[in-house]
Regions:
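Membrane-embedded alpha-helical segments of integral membrane proteins
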Residues: 1-35
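Non-catalytic, solvent-exposed segments at the cell envelope interface
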Residues: 76-80, 88-91, 97, 105-112, ...
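Juxtamembrane transmembrane-helix termini
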Residues: 36-40, 67-70
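Internal/C-terminal transmembrane anchor helices
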Residues: 43-64
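Hydrophobic alpha-helical transmembrane segments in integral membrane proteins
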Residues: 59-77
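N-terminal secretory targeting and juxtamembrane "stalk" segments of secreted and cell-surface proteins
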Residues: 34, 38, 44-47
Length: 484
């Protein structure tokens, strides 16, 4: 998503290898002819200079290609989600490892995330060589209380739930009183719906499988989910998703529409049997649940996803030499003191951009405005990466990608799209729109008590549906179409 410029070398590697090698051979032949019978000093000097020049060019080109391919191999083609189910004891408990707690009674959630818990229990059985004694609890607060009052000696819990507990009244310090004695990983295959062109007109259908798409297919419309996490943990680990953006990408009209959905949107999850939850909590159960939940909300089929780590995203921005971001308001940051942002253009380094994307308390519209600012930062990165000056920062940007984002978009699809861009040229139009709602206090599916949520404004949801449909069908939108 960092633009075609970031991926240009990969496309050159696949599409222009012949030209690259042919030019190299011709250049070497020229050097040979100049030096072969170097009776004249000037001809010999020219030959030597050209030899040094071609070595430098070939070395630099090879380095650019290597860095690009290496980066793409790292971030593309991801097909699994990892859920970490951890075993926790109180900080002062004598148990240091799982075997030390073999005689304990373990607290577990009776329904929430039960499939992952059961798989973790099976792993514990194989490791301990005996059955695990458990007590079941209906909610997070009951589970936490069981450990605090000694009813259980340890608890088995998806680590992503610790952030949820931190949000709950009377449990904000609970996670700091725990010690992890075992970590069990449960892997889930990430499903994707691959667009397939059915006619020359570019109309598409979806197939739900994990096969690689034909690299020659470029006349497609992609619907891509961008999940933004704010953590320094592993990218593949399931966690709450604080950024939820849907990209509708029409490669024929060169138009990209970004739809932001607030993290606190109170909607049924695909696994909650109709019980509403905060959208951010969908990420606890894996990226499949986040995508399926948004599919239900907007009546769409998401093809692929990008998972973006905003805590590491600052590395990319610093590698780019900073970005220019348009702010709707002049404000001082509240979460992190000491940062001031002007209305209009702001040139930001990585740390400043991270503060900008995190801020919500400085705005009357809170999380709504934060979603718009997150899209503005993504737009700033795209704008900077498509400028010619980007090439001087290219290698440092490639080095910064690892650990910042991942995607299940296959390598060949990205290379195919880049080759088309190189062949046809032309600029892309990027527009954004945010779904809205009304603040309320409700009990979410994943929590044991009431919390702040946002009740969806169906009018804005319907408008988002219409906008995405128009982009998919090839209509060119204007700024007026996405105005709030």
């Amino acid at each position: 998503m960092l633009s075609a410029s970031v991926l240009t070398s990969a496309a050159i590697l696949e599409n222009n290898r012949f030209i690259y090698n042919s030019c190299s051979i011709e250049f070497l032949l020229l050097v040979y002819l100049l030096v072969r019978k170097a009776r004249k000093k000037i001809r010999f000097i020219i030959g030597v200079v050209l030899s040094v020049l071609i070595l430098a060019v070939l070395g630099t080109g090879s380095l650019y290609i290597y860095k690009t391919v290496s980066a793409l191999d790292t971030i593309t083609g991801v097909n699994k989600d990892v859920t970490k189910i951890n075993v926790y004891v109180k900080e002062d408990d004598p148990a240091q490892k799982l075997a030390d707690a073999s005689g304990y009674t373990f607290g577990i959630l009776s329904e929430l995330d039960r499939d992952n818990t059961d798989q973790a229990l099976q792993q514990m059985y194989y490791e301990l060589g005996s059955d695990v004694q458990t007590n079941e609890y209906s909610g997070l607060s009951e589970l936490a209380d069981s450990l605090n009052n000694g009813t259980t000696g340890a608890i088995i819990l998806n680590q992503a739930y610790l952030d949820v507990l931190d949000e709950m009244d009377n449990y904000s310090s609970f996670s700091s009183q725990l010690r992890e004695i075992a970590s069990l990983q449960v892997e889930t295959v990430v499903q994707r719906k691959t667009p397939q062109v059915t006619e020359a007109t570019g109309s598409t259908t979806e197939t739900s499988d994990n096969s690689s798409a034909d690299a020659a297919v470029t006349d497609e419309v992609y619907t891509i989910y961008v999940s933004g996490i704010d953590t320094r943990g592993e990218m593949t680990a399931s966690s709450r998703s604080d950024v939820n953006i849907i990209l509708t990408v029409n490669t024929r009209t060169k138009q990209i529409l970004m739809i932001s959905t607030p993290r606190d949107y109170f909607v049924p999850l695909s696994i909650s049997n109709g019980v509403p939850d905060k959208l951010t909590h969908a990420g606890i159960y894996g990226v499949n649940v986040s995508m399926d939940t948004l599919n239900m909300l907007y009546d769409i089929n998401i093809n692929y996803y990008f998972r973006l780590n905003f805590a590491g995203f600052e590395k990319i921005i610093d590698a780019l030499g900073g970005i220019t971001v348009n702010s709707d308001y002049e404000f001082d940051s509240q979460n992190t003191k000491g940062y001031h942002f002007n209305k209009g253009e702001n040139h930001l380094n990585g740390e400043q951009a991270l503060v900008f994307t995190r801020e919500r308390y400085a705005f009357k519209e809170g999380d709504r405005q934060r979603g718009r600012d997150q899209m503005a930062v993504i737009q700033g990165v795209v704008d900077k990466a498509t400028q010619p000056a980007f090439l001087k920062n290219y290698l440092s940007v490639m080095d910064s990608l690892d650990g910042c984002f991942e995607t299940n978009v296959p390598y060949d699809i990205i290379a195919s799209l880049v080759r088309r861009q190189l062949d046809e040229g032309g600029s892309w139009q990027v527009l954004s729109y945010s779904a809205d709602g009304t603040g309320d206090t409700q009990k979410p599916y994943s929590m044991s008590q009431k919390a702040y949520v946002m009740i969806p404004d169906q009018t804005t949801v319907d408008k988002a549906k219409t906008l995405m449909k128009k982009v998919r069908e090839g209509f060119m939108l204007s700024e007026a179409d996405v105005a709030r």
